[in-house]
Amino acid sequence: NRIWVHNVAEVMGTPLTDPATVAPVMEFATEMGMVPVEIKKEKAGYLMNSLLMPLLGAASNLLVAGIAEPADIVKVWRISMGAPRGPFELFDMIGLMTPYNIGINGPNPEFARYLKEHYIDKGKLGMSTGEGFYKYPKP
């Protein structure tokens, strides 16, 4: 995650947060070179993950259902959206243990089992190990 390039700072309080603290936090984020965005209500996953999770879920469902291969799903996403990375590149960046742990007892156990069989059991955990859906330079 290249925070110095993709420099959004999501600022979210809780019902117990003094509203007077939001402005100084937003200002501090700006001083650090971030682009602050205030989230008005408490939301698990904030904004970015709330937008990202449906994409990753759709991509994993397309793969598990045998509809398309990761490279083709990524190609469609990157070309159509002008995005620098596709969903399976994002999975590799996040690390495959994270979607496995989220999915195995949650919303997507089929994908979690797929990850375990095809990648995790083979030591392919994503960028951190040099290979996941894609191969990377030695970590």
Label for each model-derived stretch:
Residues 2, 44-46:
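A short acidic, often aromatic-flanked loop/helix-cap motif at beta-alpha or helix-coil junctions
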Residues 4, 56, 81-83:
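Short acidic (Asp/Glu) and glycine-rich catalytic loops that position anionic groups and cofactors
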